[in-house]
């Protein structure tokens, strides 16, 4: 606790890290960050997995950036490109900004308004909930090519994020086992004056 009875930032970070991240032992006597931290591929992969794919919440954008129906904004969660969109029902959804077919980037603009998201590569089309709605040449051309007979569009939507709205700040997580945003932030939520809007 710091002056005023609240929790200080350092205390919050210690609690958050101890609750949500694996222990990393620091060598005794080391007072500088080793250069290896910035160039080690294995460490970078671990960081991506723990900080961005693990049970953590990451800031995505402001709700004010997508005020209208069909508005979208693009950002990244770690190295993963994501889309945050307001669907026709007014709900806010988040999903990976890569086509499930061949991994091509879907939205190349940082912001916009659209009713659907189309892949420029093979024209697979998604709605603003991340559902696959159309596959061009699903049956092939003149009996050649196409998708297998048992192909179901409903099973090939974009990878989604859980979304939390705290006073217009939109956070997302890929992890289904992540705690609620309130549990994740703990006492820091009150210290920041954040309440849950959705």
Question: Predicted regions span which residues?
Answer:
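Glycine-rich active-site/cofactor-binding loop and its immediate structural neighborhood
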Residues: 71-120
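Glycine-biased, low-complexity coil/linker segments
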Residues: 4-5
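Rieske [2Fe-2S] iron-sulfur-binding subdomain
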Residues: 13-91, 125-198
């Amino acid at each position: 606790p710091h002056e005023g009875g609240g929790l200080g930032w350092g205390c919050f970070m210690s609690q958050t890290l101890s609750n949500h991240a694996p222990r990393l032992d620091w060598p005794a006597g080391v007072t500088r960050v080793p250069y290896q931290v910035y160039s080690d591929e294995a460490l970078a992969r671990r960081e991506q997995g723990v900080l961005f794919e693990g049970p953590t919440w990451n800031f995505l954008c402001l709700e004010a950036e997508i005020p209208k129906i069909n508005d979208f904004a693009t950002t990244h969660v770690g190295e993963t490109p994501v889309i945050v969109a307001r669907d026709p029902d007014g709900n806010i959804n988040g999903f990976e900004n890569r086509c499930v077919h061949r991994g091509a980037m879907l939205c190349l603009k940082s912001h916009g308004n659209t009713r659907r998201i189309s892949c420029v590569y093979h024209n697979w089309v998604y709605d603003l909930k991340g559902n696959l709605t159309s596959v061009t040449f699903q049956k092939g051309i003149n009996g050649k090519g196409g998708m297998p007979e048992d192909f179901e569009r409903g099973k090939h939507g974009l990878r989604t994020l859980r979304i939390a709205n705290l006073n217009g700040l939109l956070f997302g997580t890929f992890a289904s086992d992540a705690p609620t945003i309130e549990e994740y932030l703990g006492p820091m939520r009150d210290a920041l004056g954040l309440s849950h809007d959705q």
